[in-house]
Structure formats: structure tokens, C-alpha cells
Amino acid sequence: MDMLHLSARPDARTVVTYHSDIVKQKRLMKLYQPLQERFLASVDCIVASSPNYVASSQTLKKYQDKTVVIPFGLEQHDVQHDPQRVAHWRETVGDNFFLFVGAFRYYKGLHILLDAAERSRLPVVIVGGGPLEAEVRREAQQRGLSNVVFTGMLNDEDKYILFQLCRGVVFPSHLRSEAFGITLLEGARFARPLISCEIGTGTSFINQDKVSGCVIPPNDSQALVEAMNELWNNEETSNRYGENSRRRFEEMFTADHMIDAYVNLYTTLLESKS
């Protein structure tokens, strides 16, 4: 896209959404960086999903005068679920557990979650699949983690039922490759307390420490255990965090908020062109 844009030189306002720095492919970044800088310098506006990412990104620091923040948003969820499906999941996993939803990738911190599950013995349900699935399942089996349940990939209805049944959402991503954290938004939509790591990205924009949940140091399984115990042993605190996460979702992270922000941005750019 960037090469096409630079070669075409369109006579139109240009907006690019910047989701993530190049984190893992550092050698590739050295080759790509000159092209990236030319491309970002040429556009009229860069959209980032959180002020946290703008502040921590070495790339975006060069373009703060043209960068705006528009968070990702989700639709409100007021659907009544099939009682039989709810009963199935309540029988399968109960209605008081910590929920992880996501791809099994190197930056998701699943090894940290398994370590915390072993130390705390608290119930954990893991939803998803991906490149590391076999490895993660094997590790859980070798550790004898009978308190950890793997569901595999689920459709939206089953996933949303688990959000409603869980005690809290755990999101132990420990690397900046996790640029935002849609799972945290989904948890907030269902008024769940959240646990995430401070990695300088949108995860700490969605989840505020001691407001909507717990923000812990990355790659620290003991800190994760302590956060899980806080939510498990203090129902009043857990409920307050959940109410706050839902309120924050309604105030900042709905699809309507996102759409309105983009409409306002496009309108402003078009008016400035004319």
C-alpha cells in the first residue's frame, strides 16, 4: 500500500490507521524504515488506537502533529442467549473462573498464565487456537493442571456466554506486539473486571489499574497470581471493577463512538481541502 501510494501521489486527503510498530522483525524493519518514513510523512493524518501507543512508539513520536487517537469500538451486546447453551457451559466450566480468549501466539503470555494457574490453583478457561496451541496444551498436561480447561475455537455465542459466566478476564500479553487488546473490550462490554500487563500499548488504555481491574508488570506470574487472588477473594472489589469497565466501555469504546470520530475526521479533512 505504501509503495502504491507514493508512486500514485493521489490528489486527495489520505488517512492511514497505524496499528502496531514492527516488533519482532527487527532486521526487516531496518530495510523497511526509509520507505515507512516517506509514506507516513506523505499522508495527511495518522490514526492510532490509543494515546498510550502514541506516547510509547518511537515511530509515531516523529508524527505527533498529524496523529489523532480513535479507539477501536464494539457494538453493544443485548442479545439473550440460548438457555440450553448457557446450561451446557455452566455444567462444563461452572460460573466462576478466569477467562482467556485469544490466539496462541508468542506475545500472548500463555506460559505466564499457566504458571499462575499452577501456583494459584484457581479455575482458568482458555478459548482459542493458533500456532502454539499444541505446545501450550502439552505444557498444561505435563504440569497436571486440572484447573485449566481448553475449549478450542468457539463461535461468538458460546464465547459471549463464557464472558457472562466468568469471574474476570485475564490478558497476560507481555510484549508490544499486543497493540490494543480487543478481548479486554469484550470483557468490559460484559462488565467483567480485567487483568492486563503494562506494556505501553492500548491494553492500559482500556484497563485502568484499580479502576476497571488490575494492571501488572509483564512476564510476572506472581503478580498475575496476586491480581487473580484479589478478584477471587474480594467480590465487592471485583464487582466494582466490572461496573467501571462497563462504564468506560460505554463512554469510550462503542462502535458508535468510533464511527462518529471517523466521520468527524473525514469531514474536517474534506473541509480543509476545499
Regions found by a protein language model. Name each.
Residues 36-82, 93-95, 150-151:
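Donor nucleotide-sugar binding/catalytic pocket of nucleotide-sugar-dependent glycosyltransferases
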Residues 1-11:
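An aromatic- and histidine-rich active-site surface loop
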